[in-house]
Amino acid sequence: MAQNQQPIFQTKPPEQFVQIPINIERDSSTTRMNQTGNTIRKPNHWPTITISIIFVIIGQSIAKLLENFYYDKTNRSEYNENRQNDGVWTQSLLQTVGFPLLLLPFLIFITKNKRNHHQQPPITSDSIHLKSLAVIYICIGIIMSVQGRLAAMGKLEIPFGVFTLIYTAQLFFTPIFAAFINKIKFNRWVVISVILAIITGALTLSSSFGGEPDEAEENYARGSWAALFAGICFALLLCNIQNVFDSYIFKRTESTNQKPSFASVFEVIIFSSLVATIISVVGLLIAGEQHDLKREMNGFSKGKGSYVMAMVGQAVSWQVYWVGIVGLVYSVSSVLSNVISVITWPIVSVLVVIFFNFMDDEFDAFKGVALVTAVLSAAAYFFRLHKDNRMAY
């Protein structure tokens, strides 16, 4: 009888010994998530964060410059009220249609991870897991397409300064969604960073835009609602992307004792953009914008070649931007990703002053202060990340 009980007595301590460190590790990662929005990504990988920020700045700056160039050279001043919103589905499409460019780096990352670290591909073979991810990617793709169309419509309905003020509201909604969806709690440094980012976005109200409507074309009711819901959609988009990482991808790699791979960033962008592209193409065809594209190309003041280059350049630049934005969600959180996206607006506005001359736009005090608050906003968040990294060791 004693011999039969002996193996049972010996098997219990190993079970307790293995279980204790797992629980401690998860609890510690949850504590870090409550402070900065970071989960099991510990410590923060500064090279990845830095490269992602550079991608956001470069991608957003070039995309916005080419967008201004597109609207400035399509002679929109000659459009009547019925054609004011021409191209909104096209602009939404340009934000996602370049996703095939990410297939090559996606495959390279997968191959490298399998060869060097014997990691499984980012896409799991679990059918239940695949179905859940498929539903989430479809939802994210829908949000991406709707957000792109609403933002494009808002900029064509109201003055760009008003659009910017309303669109900045995304920074109010991102922390709210992050608290409910991602279970993030905020410390004072993150709150300070968000407040400074809101001020930065609001101070870019003096910026101009090539597709800005004339006074007779303004529709404040429709344009304001479009700008507001575009901001809400962007905040919801970022928080859902973080939910994909935290609830699916990171748990998947954690269960197999593997480190998260940046290939998952490309995975999220590619599948979500595929859905968004399909929706935008359908919307474009229903709205009849395919006929507008030919008319715009023929009437483009810089020629057909410049028109094609502007469109292709936007598609490529937006993919660079998305890699940076989703990379920041992957590395840190949806909140930092939104903060970085907004505080790069002053850089874009300064570049518009340099390359264009919309309504005698110039570098004024608002743009100068916006650049300062942008730096302070980033510094506040990075200071908190630095403290978290020190605590992690």
UniProtKB/Swiss-Prot annotation:
Pfam families xref list: PUNUT
Residues annotated with N-acetylalanine modification: 2
A single GO BP: purine nucleobase transport
Cellular component terms (Gene Ontology): membrane; plasma membrane
Expression sites by tissue: Expressed in seedlings, leaves, embryos, ovules, seeds and the root and shoot meristems. In heart-stage embryos, detected in cells that failed to respond to cytokinins, including the prospective cotyledons.
Annotated keywords: Acetylation, Cell membrane, Cytokinin signaling pathway, Membrane, Transmembrane, Transmembrane helix, Transport
Membrane topology designation: Multi-pass membrane protein
Stretches that traverse the bilayer: 46-66, 90-110, 133-153, 161-181, 189-209, 225-245, 268-288, 308-328, 339-359, 363-383
Single GO MF annotation: purine nucleoside transmembrane transporter activity
InterPro entries registered for this protein in UniProt: PUP_plant (IPR030182)
Compartment list: Cell membrane
Function: Purine permease implicated in ATP-dependent cytokinin translocation that controls the spatiotemporal landscape of cytokinin signaling. Depletes ligands from the apoplast, which leads to a suppression of the cytokinin response.
Family label: Belongs to the purine permeases (TC 2.A.7.14) family.
Name of the molecule in the record: Purine permease 14
